[in-house]
Amino acid sequence: MRIADYSVTKAVLERHGFTFKKSFGQNFLTDTNILQKIVDTAEINKNVNVIEIGPGIGALTEFLAENASEVMAFEIDERLVPILEDTLRDHDNVKVINEDVLKADLQTRVKEFENPDLPIKVVANLPYYITTPILMHLIESKIPFSEFVVMMQKEVADRISAEPNTKAYGSLSIAVQYYMTTKMAFAVPRTVFVPAPNVDSAILKMTRRKQPLVEVKDEDFFFRVSKASFLHRRKTLWNNLTSHFGKSEEVKNKLDQALENAAIKPSIRGEALSISDFARLSDALREAGL
């Protein structure tokens, strides 16, 4: 019997008198086939260390521990720590850390792996309400995570993996794809969770690029420009950029010059620009002194 078997999950929750907290976005997976598919998608083996976020009662952790060298699981809800100690007692390669991963000193934590030189993968069923902040925090950290295999709201997975000229494409697509290649692995129905969420889920596989997708002179400015360009989706690039940078004649002249130098029409919308277009645009705007 597995932790994820519905009867086992139910028994564990009852034994420990656990009640779900909405504020933590807790939905526990009760489908062993999906858990095995997650591990297979992530290609977990004994030459890989894993960081898991939000292990819950250990359903995914159990599968990871059987396949990985070590698992470091960050759980923000202190009520789940004794439950995890109970459900994972047979796995001595799991370290449960009662900490908010957004506040954790990850640089120090990853040195606590017995074999810290092994590749580190992030495999997680992320709380939906905080998926994007956690993902960007991990991607932008200086830790060379080789891969992320993450369950998230399908709508967010669509946005991350979206191509230009689609409704889902936006600054989040650019922010992630700048660092990672993305692949939608498979969909997960809401019926396989306890309690069932109000949305459908998907597993997204993200692999770190050896080099960022495009070369830019100032990364922070590049991301600032891409965010500004999607400020109001229905507005033109020109309108969004003037809303962000200002509407003085001096600013407008600089914008005009930058757009001309980047060979980008002011009348198009942000969603029509590729990531390389945004790289050209941000460099031109920076050069213009904006």
UniProtKB/Swiss-Prot annotation:
Reactions accelerated catalytically: adenosine(1518)/adenosine(1519) in 16S rRNA + 4 S-adenosyl-L-methionine = N(6)-dimethyladenosine(1518)/N(6)-dimethyladenosine(1519) in 16S rRNA + 4 S-adenosyl-L-homocysteine + 4 H(+)
Gene Ontology MF terms in the entry: 16S rRNA (adenine(1518)-N(6)/adenine(1519)-N(6))-dimethyltransferase activity; RNA binding
Record-listed E.C. numbers: 2.1.1.182
Keywords: Cytoplasm, Methyltransferase, RNA-binding, rRNA processing, S-adenosyl-L-methionine, Transferase
Primary site of residence: cytoplasm
PROSITE patterns from the UniProt entry: RRNA_A_DIMETH, SAM_RNA_A_N6_MT
Subcellular location: Cytoplasm
InterPro entries referenced in this protein's UniProt entry, alphabetically: KsgA/Erm, rRNA_Ade_diMease-like_C, rRNA_Ade_Mease_Trfase_CS, rRNA_Ade_methylase_Trfase_N, rRNA_adenine_dimethylase, SAM-dependent_MTases_sf
Gene3D superfamilies named in the record: Ribosomal RNA adenine dimethylase-like, domain 2, Vaccinia Virus protein VP39
Protein name in UniProt: Ribosomal RNA small subunit methyltransferase A
